[in-house]
Curated annotation (Swiss-Prot):
One matching Pfam family: Ribosomal_S5
Domain of life: Bacteria
Reported function: With S4 and S12 plays an important role in translational accuracy.
Subunit record text: Part of the 30S ribosomal subunit. Contacts proteins S4 and S8.
Lineage start: Bacteria, Pseudomonadati, Chlorobiota, Chlorobiia, Chlorobiales
Family to which the UniProt record says this protein belongs: Belongs to the universal ribosomal protein uS5 family.
Gene Ontology cellular-component terms listed: small ribosomal subunit
Name the UniProt record assigns to this protein: Small ribosomal subunit protein uS5
SUPFAM superfamilies named in the record: dsRNA-binding domain-like, Ribosomal protein S5 domain 2-like
Length: 171
């Protein structure tokens, strides 16, 4: 199977899917209304890989299947340390803003709606989140994924700065 942009092979991962939202659309034609559906699906292995997809079709099941296929093409790696994220993130997509804060073990996944689905599929167990601005599930999911993409763990920071881990934590 082909690699995604980050070199992740979705075929080698044990991806599960979670349906976030289904929307029914209508097209008015001469004989009445034609209904279509679109589905937002989040896929992940609950071990640090997560992606989202949008599927559109005339039937709900077909839309979900297309969403899953699209989600497998957009899988990203999320650094998870002791069940939480390494640092606080504020991510924005459109007018949707998502704030994610690391939490101590035992706190649980405190998130609502679309953000919860993304974090569950990523495998994050302890995190505090707040969704601000738009509650449109399309934009909230995209903001959450953008935030998770932007996380950098200490090894990445040390490599970018050409320093050791000890030097990074001292500065």
């Amino acid at each position: 199977m082909a690699k995604t942009a980050k070199g992740i092979r979705p075929g080698e991962l044990n991806l599960k899917e979670k349906l976030v939202h289904i929307n029914r659309t209508a097209k008015v034609v001469k004989g009445g209304k034609r209904f279509g559906f679109n589905a937002i699906v989040v896929v992940g292995d609950k071990e640090g890989h997560v992606g989202y997809g949008l599927g559109k079709a005339n039937e709900v099941q077909d839309a979900i299947a297309k969403g899953v296929e699209d989600g497998k093409k957009n899988v990203v790696k999320v650094p998870i340390i002791k069940g939480t994220i390494p640092h606080q993130i504020v991510a924005k997509y459109g007018s949707a803003k998502v704030l994610m804060k690391p939490a101590t073990p035992g706190t649980g996944l405190i998130a609502g709606g679309a953000v919860r689905a993304v974090l569950e599929m990523a495998g994050v167990r302890d995190v505090l989140t707040k969704s601000l601005g738009s509650s449109n599930p399309h934009n909230v999911v995209k903001a959450a994924i953008l935030g998770l993409k932007s996380i950098s763990d200490a090894n990445d920071v040390a490599e970018r700065r050409s320093k050791s881990l000890k030097e990074v934590f001292e500065s």
